[in-house]
UniProtKB/Swiss-Prot annotation:
Residues 358-479 are annotated as: Disordered. This is H/ACA ribonucleoprotein complex subunit CBF5. Pfam families: DKCLD, PUA, TruB_C_2, TruB_N. Residues 435-460 have a biased composition (Basic residues). One of its GO terms (cellular component) is box H/ACA snoRNP complex. Catalytic subunit of H/ACA small nucleolar ribonucleoprotein (H/ACA snoRNP) complex, which catalyzes pseudouridylation of rRNA. This involves the isomerization of uridine such that the ribose is subsequently attached to C5, instead of the normal N1. Pseudouridine ('psi') residues may serve to stabilize the conformation of rRNAs and play a central role in ribosomal RNA processing. The H/ACA snoRNP complex also mediates pseudouridylation of other types of RNAs. Catalyzes pseudouridylation at position 93 in U2 snRNA.
Amino acid sequence: MSSKEDYIIKPESVSPSNDTSQWPLLLKNYDKLLVRSGHYTPIPAGSAPLNRDIKSYVSSGVINLDKPSNPSSHEVVAWIKRILRVEKTGHSGTLDPKVTGCLIVCIDRATRLVKSQQGAGKEYVCIVRLHEQLKDDKELNRALENLTGALFQRPPLISAVKRQLRVRTVYDSKLIEFDNKRGLGVFWASCEAGTYMRTLCVHLGMLLGVGGHMQELRRVRSGAMSESDNLVTLHDVLDAQYVYDNTRDESYLRKIIQPLESLLVGYKRVVVKDSAVNSVCYGAKLMIPGLLRYEEGIELYDEVVLMTTKGEAIAIGIAQMSTVDLQSCDHGIVAKVKRCIMERDTYPRRWGLGPIAQKKKQMKADGKLDKYGRVNENTPENWKKDYKDLDEQPAPPIPESKLVAPEPQLPKKKSLIEEVEVDIDVEDKSEKKEKKDKKEKKEKKDKKEKKEKKDKKEKKRKAEDDSSKSEKKKKSKKD
């Protein structure tokens, strides 16, 4: 027999918590986010990024592509557009034709994130060829250490941009291998977007006093994605589309394409109520009542990602409050939208559902208000009393100090010198105008003469051609 105590819920100081460390994408460590409110009404609209239907999964996806050597980045992106039969594709930063490695290809809706990825940091593995042997093998390592931090760079001779001097930052570099006899060195570098590795190799050669150039280059990281993050080849993309077209098997296509949320995992997160999602998609600012959870360490004007409770990215926003403010404030703007990602009306509209808004809607339908919600001849008197037309409101009263009329000011008499100067200016203007008119007339006359000469030449040439043709015909008849 079991005792009665077995069925009693005992009070505990520790509540069981979900392990969210294995949750995907933006939902990872969801339980560690700070809670603003736990009360909201879930809406069945939308879906988790990994559970989208295949059409919307592809149109809001990104591919971490291993770019092959020889074709340009634009060619590769155009090929993917043709293979997947999508409307738009974009990439995360150009790679030279001979360069290989990470090229993030954004599809359709994900192209809205291209700008943020182009400005993100990059990592490269580079082979440098030195023109002469070094006296000491350690010299190359020392030179690499010197070439870190902010550096002046001018684009190479053959480049797509204007060759202006610019400052680019190399954050870190590491020598992997060096063969002094062959003059070949392999090094890794982490740098700012827009750094020219070719120029860096030339500078290395100059610093060592032997000269050098870039032999080979591979990008191993671009923004949020590296070689280890599901890197795929063009053949994989082609095969995946072929398998889907012929067998309707989505698994291969889902494997090579990742949701756009995978690019945003580095941003601070702000979780939005389902009822506020569509208003943010229409460009509204996120206010405190629409906030559910937020991350630690948000500072004023930081870039944050606004997300739903299902883990979908709504928009990239600019924080208008820090984490400390979000904890203490009960009203105000949380974030302004910088770039909207989600399509409008994915979630239903939840504004205009209050009693006054509903009444106004009904009155518009009955013809008691015009289509803009303004008063007309059918509007009831009780509504007119409370209605305020902002266009017809009286202007604010003018302060008494400004009501005093200013003293009338008589026009100042000009001196004789000023009058003469004015006359000279008028004469100069009239002379300039006359000269301009004469010039225009002369140009028109010249054009007309040229045209006439041209026409005469054409007529003469045609007459000569006709006469030569007639002579040929006569000769042929005689023969």
